[in-house]
Amino acid sequence: DLVRSRGLGDVYKRQVHGMAQRGGSVSTQVRWGDKVYGPVFGKGEADIMVALEKMEAVRYAEFLNPDGVAVINDYAIKSTTIASGAEEYPEGCIEAMQKNFKTIAVSASDIAIQLGNPKCMNVVLFGAMCDSLGCPEIDWEQIVAETVPAKVKELNLKAFRAGREAAKASK
């Protein structure tokens, strides 16, 4: 609705929750362009990936096109099997992504905690991602200000700016 309301084209999304309630993966596909007919894209077709956890970036890397950008939260969530010791968390997730894609790795969870609310981690990642969208004419900060509740507006603006700065430092 936000994209359409600003005359920026069509946008469609699809979410797959799978075993999310049991610590499993969640994926969302978003397609945005002048004319979009549906939300689904295939392997190697995504221009940008935003991963809220670094192992998830590797898990879904096959959807990113070779010139795509991976924006990754440098954070590990230990699944039940890893927490129990049955498996080990894989090392080198971000490095593996850097070998194949332009990668922006930021400690979004840590930044959100430093700002006082871990729930704003997604806004930190949004800030880290926005310059990769190739839309300099869009005032993303204004969009954040207009779309979040007034009581958390300043927090979200700080999170957005911190994400943008972290992305610049990551390059």
How would you describe each model-predicted region?
Residues 96-123, 128-171:
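Aromatic-enriched
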Residues 13-41:
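N-terminal beta-loop-helix "entrance" segment that forms/cooperates
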Residues 36-76:
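Glycine-rich phosphate-binding loop
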Residues 16-18, 54, 75-76, 108-109:
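Short, ordered loop/turn segments at secondary-structure junctions
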Residues 1-12:
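Single conserved hydrophobic/aromatic residue that forms the stacking wall/gate
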Residues 19-24, 40-43, 62-64, 95-98, ...:
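Solvent-exposed alpha-helices and their adjacent loops that cap or buttress functional pockets
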Residues 79-101:
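Rossmann-fold NAD(P)-binding glycine/threonine-rich loop
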Residues 9-10, 29, 47-49, 68-71, ...:
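Structural motif
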